[in-house]
């Protein structure tokens, strides 16, 4: 089977690395970004399109990686009339349960096949081609998108019909956010009890309570390394998606409610564009 032609819409924190890995795998690639200057650095590996319509015209796979469901929907509306009946829309933005249902309906209206496939991982895994893809959608389109998924990820988990991927992504993000906030609180408690907060990381290192993520985010908190791998503003957006999904399922997530409040406090203090580990600054 020949390599698919790919249109990647959204070349921000995640999209740039994904684009480079798709191109490195030999797939013809066109890229577009709402802020055009964010796409221009990819001119060495892809065709930088001046419009969504130009990017998607003739593409076999259209990949969306933008901020939220409204951004995704607005972007794909600009593709209307340029999408072929065999086009597969590989939707990888985090949009939540209702968002995925909304986009599935839009895909039907646009006349394209829809695969809901958010990812686990942030900027570095995206650059390294090491994302975990949570894919959901019709089985018959899988061979057509496998080259793309193999290029951007180290593993693809197929989890059912379209929408299942977004539901699993929320559960995974709930765990990530809880861990980040837990690290921040443990460091703050160590500090305010009169100890060097680095002692917390030393105490758990290498034991059953440790994990690479604990050391990574904990060290970032102590060193002030807040360059955004996952910006607080995006984490707050996703926390709202998690709580909305839980409410729809009749589930009370008390811990996540508290995490969301701390993220909001950090965003209100001006840290929204910093990494979510900057929640530590407001403890």
What does each model-identified segment do?
Residues 1-64, 123:
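NAD(P)+-binding Rossmann beta1-loop-alpha1 motif at the extreme N-terminus of oxidoreductases
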Residues 166, 175, 210-277, 282-283:
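Interdomain hinge/lid region at the active-site interface
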Residues 75, 94-173:
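Rossmann-fold dinucleotide-binding core
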Residues 53-112:
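Rossmann-fold NAD(P) dinucleotide-binding segment
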Residues 129-136, 157, 161-193, 202-216, ...:
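Active-site-proximal catalytic alpha-helix in oxidoreductases
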Residues 29, 48, 113-115, 156, ...:
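Hydrophobic beta-strand scaffold residues
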């Amino acid at each position: 089977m020949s390599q698919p032609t790919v249109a990647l819409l959204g070349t921000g924190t995640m999209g740039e690395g994904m684009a480079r890995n798709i191109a490195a795998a030999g797939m013809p690639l066109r890229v577009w970004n709402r802020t055009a200057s964010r796409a221009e650095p990819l001119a060495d590996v892809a065709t930088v399109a001046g419009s969504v319509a130009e990017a998607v015209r003739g593409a076999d796979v259209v990949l969306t990686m933008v901020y939220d469901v409204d951004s995704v929907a607005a972007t794909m509306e600009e593709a209307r009339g340029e999408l072929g009946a065999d086009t597969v829309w590989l939707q990888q933005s985090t949009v939540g349960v209702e968002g995925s249902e909304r986009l599935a309906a839009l895909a039907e209206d646009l006349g394209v096949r829809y695969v809901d496939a958010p990812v686990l991982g942030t900027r570095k895994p995206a650059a390294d081609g090491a994302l975990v893809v949570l894919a959901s959608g019709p089985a018959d389109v899988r061979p057509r998108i496998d080259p793309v998924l193999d290029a951007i990820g180290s593993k693809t988990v197929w989890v059912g019909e379209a929408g299942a991927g977004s539901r699993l992504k929320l559960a995974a993000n709930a765990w990530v956010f809880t861990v980040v906030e837990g690290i921040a609180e443990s460091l703050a408690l160590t500090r305010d009890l009169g100890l060097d907060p680095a002692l917390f990381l030393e105490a758990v290192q290498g034991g059953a309570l440790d994990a690479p993520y604990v050391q990574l985010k904990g060290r970032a908190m102590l060193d002030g390394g807040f360059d955004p791998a996952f910006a607080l503003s995006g984490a707050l957006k996703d926390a709202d998606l998690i709580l909305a999904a839980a409410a729809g399922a009749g589930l009370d997530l008390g811990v996540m409610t508290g995490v969301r409040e701390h993220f909001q406090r950090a965003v209100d203090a001006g840290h929204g564009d910093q990494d979510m580990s900057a929640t530590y600054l407001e403890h």
